[in-house]
Amino acid sequence: SVYLYHQKQLFKESDGKEDFFTKPLSFDSKYCSVILGDDGSNLEEVDRILNQFHIVNSSLEDRKTIKSIVHSIVLRSARLMASFVHAIYAHMGDEYKGCTVGVDGSVYKYMPHYQEWVNNALEELGRPDIDIGLADDGSCIGAALVAFGVARG
């Protein structure tokens, strides 16, 4: 998207003040959730988000391109997550068949299609037996388990 922007193939009608392409941490995952969830014919929610970043008069083609880029990034994230889980279980050995992994976090919980994409990637990796489940307050539970393990010595 940075390349397309600098080549003026994206946001052609814009005044060139789109710093969210180059400013770190300016485009939050909540925007990705909204963009992926926008199934309207004119992608009005995508346009609304772009307006928040002072990108006005975006074309439908611009909005489709942004949605496609976000789709690719989030799909890659889901596939990377699946590969990390697979790698951990591969390292642990064959005795861990049919395990459940608890996951906490807003990306896993709220991002459209994310859970499905993680599960699909695990199946592609030959591990449909790994079940990923949402664990609300997972970080608190994880901290408690670590503290328990340390206390037991």
Q: Which residues does each PLM region occupy?
A:
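ATP-binding/phosphotransfer module of carbohydrate and carboxylate kinases, centering on a glycine-rich
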Residues: 1-153
